[in-house]
C-alpha cells in the first residue's frame, strides 16, 4: 500500500515540526511511503524544522510559492503533491498546525474510508484540543469546517482515475463565485468536494478519529493574545517531544 503524505509550511515552522514529531510518536514515519513536504519561502525560523525533516529522511522542498501571494496557495501546492505522485493508493493531506493525539490515526482513517465505497475521502473529527469534538454550535455555524467541504487538515483521499482527472481539471484550490448581490468564497477543497458530489461520491467526517488543530496559524487572523497562546502551547509541546 503506497501512501503519499502532503503538507505545506507557510510561516508555521514550529507548528510543522510539532506535527511531524507527534506523527512519528503515534503513527511512525515509516507508515507513509512518500513524504511530499513543501515550504512557501517561509520567513520565520525554519532551522529546527528543516533539521528534523532531514534527520527523519523527509527533506522539505520549496513549493515555488511565497508567503506574500495575493491568494491562498494551499490547494495549488496540495495539487502539486498529488500530480507528482500519481501511483499512490492513498493521499494524506496534512495541515502544518495539527498535533497527533491518538495512536494509528492513518490506518484507522483508511479502514473507515474503505468501509464506504461511495466515499472518495475522509477527514478527522474537528477538534481544538485533540480530545473533544468542537462544539456543535461552532460546526453548525461554519459548515466549511468539515461538512460543506473536505477539510485538508488531516484527510485521506482514495486515488482513482476520477480523482486524478478532477485534480488536473478542477484542482484543490480556492474559488470565488460571483452573484448579483454578493460573492461566495469556496475554501480549499470545496469545489472539488462539490464536483465529486455530481459523480455521486461523498466525503466522510469521522466521529471518533481526531487530531488537535490549532487553526488559522498561517495568516494573521487571530488576536495577538490568542496567537500568543497558540504559540506558547506549541513551544511547550515541542519541548516535551524534543526531550
Give the residues covered by each predicted segment.
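Hydrophobic targeting segments
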Residues: 2-7, 23, 34-37
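Conserved catalytic core of nucleotide-sugar-dependent glycosyltransferases
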Residues: 101-180
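A conserved acidic beta->alpha catalytic loop
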Residues: 38-49
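Short, well-formed alpha-helical segments that are part of the catalytic scaffolds
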Residues: 12-27
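Short glycine/serine/threonine-enriched helix-capping/active-site loop
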Residues: 63, 122-127, 206-207
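C-terminal catalytic/acceptor-binding lobe
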Residues: 175-243
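Short beta-strand-to-loop acidic/aromatic patch adjacent to the donor-nucleotide binding site
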Residues: 88-99
Amino acid at each position: 500500500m503506497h501512501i503519499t503524505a502532503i503538507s505545506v509550511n507557510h510561516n508555521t515552522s514550529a507548528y510543522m515540526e510539532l506535527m511531524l514529531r507527534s506523527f512519528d510518536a503515534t503513527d511512525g514515519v515509516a507508515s507513509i511511503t512518500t513524504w511530499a513536504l513543501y515550504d512557501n519561502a517561509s520567513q520565520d525560523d525554519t532551522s529546527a524544522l528543516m533539521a528534523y525533516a532531514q534527520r527523519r529522511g523527509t527533506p522539505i522542498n520549496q513549493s515555488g510559492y511565497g508567503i506574500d501571494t495575493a491568494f491562498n496557495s494551499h490547494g495549488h501546492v496540495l495539487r502539486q503533491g498529488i500530480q507528482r505522485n500519481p501511483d499512490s493508493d492513498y493521499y494524506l493531506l496534512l495541515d502544518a498546525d495539527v498535533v497527533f493525539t491518538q495512536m494509528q490515526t492513518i490506518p484507522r482513517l483508511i479502514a473507515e474510508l474503505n468501509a464506504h465505497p461511495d466515499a472518495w475521502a475522509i477527514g478527522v473529527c474537528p477538534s481544538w484540543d485533540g480530545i473533544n469534538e468542537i462544539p456543535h454550535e461552532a460546526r453548525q455555524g461554519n459548515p466549511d469546517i468539515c461538512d460543506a467541504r473536505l477539510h485538508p487538515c488531516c484527510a485521506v483521499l482514495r486515488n482513482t482515475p476520477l480523482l486524478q482527472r478532477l485534480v488536473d481539471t478542477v484542482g484543490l484550490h480556492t474559488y470565488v463565485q460571483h452573484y448579483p448581490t454578493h460573492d461566495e468564497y469556496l475554501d480549499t477543497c470545496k469545489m472539488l468536494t462539490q464536483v465529486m458530489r455530481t459523480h455521486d461520491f461523498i466525503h466522510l467526517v469521522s466521529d471518533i478519529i481526531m487530531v488537535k488543530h490549532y487553526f488559522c496559524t498561517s495568516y494573521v487572523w487571530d488576536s495577538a493574545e490568542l496567537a500568543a497562546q497558540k504559540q506558547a502551547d506549541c513551544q511547550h509541546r515541542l519541548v516535551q517531544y524534543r526531550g
